[in-house]
């Protein structure tokens, strides 16, 4: 029996050789592999396959998956493939071919009476996003992030305090305890970073033992060589990550001074281009070091005609500057440079910048990490053409490079890749389903720990789920004890050994960060390029390995106004 590709795609989704456009970008992906057995596909519905004695077996709950996502197109750093995905006990149990093993061949995911089904036909499945630059200014950020497809938030803060408005620090054991207790209320994986600015180890050690999964050095607290050295020494001892916002004003040294203070030790450099803060004008040099794990924040993603003007106003507010003070204005203007922002676009495309995050409410938008990433990818595709590794007529390699920037690479950087960050067997089932036309803009379904935590949903009083008004709403995994069972709170090993979860009465599942101190940039997937960066101190022009990096700002972006008319 034969079926046309068009009819097959309509029924079961695209298969090997088919191409799919991502939203309204010019990025096309091509299916590399299909795990199905043609003619044995499983699909739920009236008159369909997943029925008793057909695609559904008689096996007990222990032998079948709890949830099956059928015929989904997976986009992850490791591939672009079509598969059934089985979830069990909150984790990804299998990727492959689902069905009834009693009557169907090559089944590695058994369906039974205890199996729920999510139809993935014609849908794209990705890992939940990981945002590693969160200012916890207001709790409403968390729902905003979740509805955008982010399922893990890492950063610091205590609410709308002046310190938190500027820095991602949950300062001290008392504040750490309050924030860990607050994290129980949310269907979101959360980890908090303490304040790393101290020249003696004891004030930092007590924060790690209180639950901090990392330490944040910020110039507003004084990112001096002494505090950098001390902070990295504590991190090495306790296996937690260090993130840094370096010294924009070059008060305690220049970029070479800071890089020297690292002493080859692993560090995550926030907004490494510099508009978000850091040695002016050449902090961007840091992305060429093997021990530096560089990220961007999303307001500079991608470079557009509005980027410069927007940043000046944002900076004055976020860093408590006064526009009537000439020195404050000069400080702001020194950070915002067309030349380095343009270079940042290209360095992302080359894989020299490895991660993208938000800088939530502190010069960044918490709900736009995913969108800004794909807008950058599309801009670079249009301006620079296919990457080496892309196939004929597809952008598969570029897509893998960019999705890694907000999934697996932040997970590796912060020691949580054993739990989250990819669509792989054994990982926590934090998954996002997208309609291709809305990919990267508006997800359809967000799963946390194998349960549906958020979704597009129509009128609750309607006779079917789809009537307007359709908007994002929290689902059952966002409520009661379900959120405790399906979301993670990350803490340090030292805090676990100190009994912090029991002392604070934490209800969410606890996971420990590990392997933070031996990560090198070469470990960051598809984003491990180590260029020799030069910045002209007069013109701010950037060269990588002797090649000038410049691109024009975009006048129009995809994934923008046409998606947000309602």
UniProtKB/Swiss-Prot annotation:
Q: Where is the active site?
A: 319
Which parts of the sequence belong to the Urease domain?
128-566
- Which residues are noted in the entry as Ni(2+) 2-binding? 216, 245, 271
GO-annotated cellular components = cytoplasm
- Coarse class of the primary localization is cytoplasm
What SUPFAM superfamilies does the record point to? Composite domain of metallo-dependent hydrolases (SSF51338), Metallo-dependent hydrolases (SSF51556)
Modified residue annotations for N6-carboxylysine: 216
The note on cofactor binding and number reads: Binds 2 nickel ions per subunit.
This chain's protein is named: Urease subunit alpha
Q: Where in the cell is it found?
A: Cytoplasm
Primary gene name: ureC
Cofactor(s) annotated in UniProt: Ni cation
Q: Which GO terms describe its biological process?
A: urea catabolic process
The residues that hold substrate are 218
> Which reaction equations make up its catalytic activity?
urea + 2 H2O + H(+) = hydrogencarbonate + 2 NH4(+)
Tell me, how does this one assemble? Heterotrimer of UreA (gamma), UreB (beta) and UreC (alpha) subunits. Three heterotrimers associate to form the active enzyme.
- Name the protein family: Belongs to the metallo-dependent hydrolases superfamily. Urease alpha subunit family.
| GO MF annotations, alphabetized | nickel cation binding; urease activity
